Amino acid sequence: MEKISSKEKIIFELRKRKKDVYFWAISLSIVLIILIFICTKENSLYFVLSSMAQTLSFIIIILRVTQNQSCSEISINYLICFIIMLVSRLITNIFSSYDIEISLINSIFLYLSQIISLLICFYLLYLIYFVYPETSDKMFDNKLPFYYILIPTFILAIFFKPYIFRNRIFDVLFVFSIILESVAIYPQIILFTTKKGEIETYTSNFIAFQGLSTVFILIFWYKNYAFVNDRKSLLLGGFAGYAIIVSELFQLIFMGYYFYLYFKSIMKRKKIKKFDL
């Protein structure tokens, strides 16, 4: 019997724990990014980190889809909501300007992360509908259709519209994208609660990074909520910043029990059972 070298043992263990290696490599990347950007001391830093955490979450899920050749556990309604949110945000960022200070390097990382996330979402929809349609969970992804989220969110955006771009369309799109971002994840969480079985490691990490993104964006708006409050508004524009913070807090509360199960599963090295949710 041949003796296995230490190098071969290490390679074997790394291959065996490939999912964990991916996860911690991405986590380390986030830590390094934070250390690089923290010296800027800009409020926009948290907005950029939130966007990058979202991008990393989509990179995780695309790795899972390509490796398993399966689109199960991915909510189509969530992807549609997220695409519309990103398009709305990119429109307001590209064709208008506001007074929040942001450096050139932060702007580059912000736009780059948003564009990458958008492309991955479109690619995921392509895989779901044309490459692996038989693996999707369309039967379980019908509890909260995307238009149930988009319509109320757009109405709220009209009422809470601030006056920061001096253009009604951009003002509405700006608030619409922020509120939509805080509620877009709901179809994905509901899909987990509807389908029985275990949540895969990749999918668990995907939601974890989405939660990290929410924490960063909540910190950002806590520091900048007064910026979007329009005291001259005839509707509810004077409370726009408060509405944003409440929506982000509500999302964290909604996802709180999931995070409890997520960290519990990491400690015990077990997958999350969907009947626990």
PLM segments and residue spans:
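Alpha-helical membrane-protein topology signature
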Residues: 1-277
